[in-house]
């Protein structure tokens, strides 16, 4: 999606384009992309037209089929990042028309989205090409084009009077004027519903939400979950947070917290500018040094092969203040080898010396274990620091982008005595998520 938005911005910089008359459409792999962009960024489009593709991982990829290694609990939780079915409610404010060939196996995508939308009380217009496999039926395509042109003529409403939004992560914090600013628990469902009352008042209801941002210039009155909240002088936007069960005006109290742009899991760092930082020193243990060197090269190769770019990389002695300000730092090695990691270690949530790696009270032999971790950078809490991983799917997922979902949560400990394979970088002996305060 980063590529999509950068390409869109480049076109908009050169052409005069009405932002309220942009639609998203695609077929097959482009259909999968459209399901994602429509549900996760619903407030941007005048309409969406996904054709074929896939809309979720489990059923489409048959991950629970006999003989397959079952996904871990954290993998299943992280399907909530990309599954369009988990974000179906957002299509309530994005007119969407699906297309499928009648005999196309990828009709499955529209079928599962129809079911997901029905659970939200919504219906999905679904055009079907009779007797058609994996392509557009010419006459049905003409019908689809006419419908989309009518929706473009109407255009997107930049300030809808009513909004319903849902998310599992603050990576996708809402739409238009109604936005999540804090969640009760990442990867559990959170909902917002809002109704404007004239130009200066709004009613909001929440679920699984601890902070809300209302981008409504001139707003004076807020009723949230039935509670009236007094606002200070009108401003371009208002932030409210819940504390001790009571909604209050203003941002949440200062301190580490998951928020838009800082949510985890480890793959989240690669949706923005990042920098691989390789060690220049000697690892405490040969096994750790060999493993981190191999994993760094694998990460660089994957980035070139799948994402068609060269991952930026610097030595640990060459990182600048500008790098700290602009990039998520991906640190490779152990504190004996990587000087920047050694510098940051006192402010990271683990203890690591030449003998022992300790994380969350569990002590492990540092000769045979290494951490994978994402955490706010102590030198710049607006950015991440990541330890010892690139994009975390491996060879097993290369055959289908439906499998290229996050494989690891916020942190993991790897036993290096099991060599890396097609699914894992070694034996994962523990893995989990930090809470909303990065604890």
Where are these regions (language model features)?
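Beta-strand-rich binding/interaction modules
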Residues: 189-228
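Conserved strand-to-loop "acid loop" that flanks and positions the catalytic carboxylate
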Residues: 97-104, 130-131, 206-208
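Solvent-exposed alpha-helical segments and adjacent loops
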Residues: 215-439
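Mobile cap/lid helix-loop segments that gate and shape the active-site cleft of serine hydrolases
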Residues: 46-88, 93-94
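Gly/Ser-rich "nucleophile elbow"/oxyanion-hole loop immediately N-terminal to the catalytic nucleophile
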Residues: 1-28, 39-45, 90
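C-terminal catalytic histidine-bearing segment of alpha/beta-hydrolase fold enzymes
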Residues: 103-198
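Short beta-strand immediately N-terminal to the catalytic nucleophile in serine-hydrolase-like folds
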Residues: 24-26, 51, 99
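Hydrolases whose catalytic domains are alpha/beta-hydrolase-1, hotdog thioesterase
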Residues: 33-37
